[in-house]
Amino acid sequence: MKYKLLPCLLAILLTGCDRTEVTLSFTPEMASFSNEFDFDPLRGPVKDFTQTLMDEQGEVTKRVSGTLSEEGCFDSLELLDLENNTLVALVLDANYYRDAETLEKRVRLQGKCQLAELPSAGVSWETDDNGFVIKASSKQMQMEYRYDDQGYPLGKTTKSNDKTLSVSATPSTDPIKKLDYTAVTLLNNQRVGNVKQSCEYDNHANPVDCQLIIVDEGVKPAVERVYTIKNTIDYY
């Protein structure tokens, strides 16, 4: 992945030229993992992060925590979903991610530290020449992923039996505010939902506080839910 650095003139307006230059692109690992594990991708030399999703009552519904090496590999990843009462904790061990508690091999890796296979579910991933995951497949489904020139995930299409679910995201035209986006979900070409997110950003152009509005158009009348996302991020 080639990195595009923000010119100093623009950096002055954002953070001052005495600060670390802003990396505008996303690494293949960060972008691909965010697709698979459902969290907002981050940029720059991230050391560790926690991303917390809260509902309108301020109750935590989901939390994702990760630690990364200086090379951008995920050393550990924990996913807590309180709505579905699930917890997944993975730790890196050579070419696998193991369950942090049982040490069972859960995810096989390819290349430096990219997703390759989830043996228990029969899922395998394919990457493009730049190392981004662009396809996932199993006996039951096929998924295709899309990215922009900076590696930002633009959505995915999932085909399973006679159903096709497509999510298409449109990020802000401001490269600094990439996580300000809108998205539309189609089921068999029929619109069933939309999403809008707006954020405040830190000096690395990563979101710190976000408002996420999710509208379920598959029911009548449509149901709108408002969430808050808070990120705590440490850098190298």
From Swiss-Prot:
It is a lipid-anchor. InterPro entries: UPF0257 (IPR010646). GO terms for cellular component: plasma membrane. A lipid is attached at C17 (S-diacylglycerol cysteine). Pfam families: UPF0257 (PF06788). PROSITE patterns: PROKAR_LIPOPROTEIN (PS51257). It comes from the Bacteria. Residues 1-16 form the signal peptide. Its main location: membrane. Keywords: Cell membrane, Lipoprotein, Membrane, Palmitate, Signal. It is found in: Cell membrane. A lipid is attached at C17 (N-palmitoyl cysteine). Belongs to the UPF0257 family. This is UPF0257 lipoprotein YnfC. It comes from Escherichia coli O45:K1 (strain S88 / ExPEC). The gene is ynfC.
